[in-house]
Amino acid sequence: MKRFLNHRLLYVLLSSLIACTIQAIKLEDSPFSFGQKYRGEKFLIAGCGWDKVAVIDKRTCRFEWVHTIGKGEDCNDVEVTREQNILYAYTAGARLITPGQHVVWDYKVGGNEELFTATQLFDGGYLLAICGHPARIVELDNNGRTIKEIHFETGIETVHNQFRQIEKTRRNTYLIPLFGSGELIEMNVSG
């Protein structure tokens, strides 16, 4: 019965996170001291309206690691990087932190912009996508310095309704899901 309740608790917690991002963590070479006993049974979670980024043990439903984000910093994208750091997007920026909670870099956006995409690229750099007028795709090097910035218009007036989770393909194009129009567009690096 207790096991059922733990799984029920995990289900309720995960389903209550609106726009929740969940990533199963690969534990090989992980700095998280969760051991190899439950290989692949940890989840990195975050969600809009929740003030944390956390690692949860699937079996016990216990928090193994928690990072509290600031008031109003809704997290919409989170991942463990190849270097085993935590990268997450929050409405006013993106942040890369170590498992020890040290901030490696913190990229902030302007007052009329919102950032909902932060992901590590194939080459080890980072991709950030910023809703605004104009919207921007920003690529950072592995130290968090801007190396490329592309400006474009989405045709969607309300900044919050523009897009989420942009992806860069191996063909050097960007896939952009436009919320306001229901379209998926592909854009090259020239914009």
Q: Where do the language-model regions lie?
A:
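Secretory-pathway ectodomains
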Residues: 25-191
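Accessible peptide chain termini
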Residues: 1-2, 144
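Bacterial N-terminal signal peptides
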Residues: 11-19
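Bacterial N-terminal signal peptides that target proteins for export
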Residues: 2-11
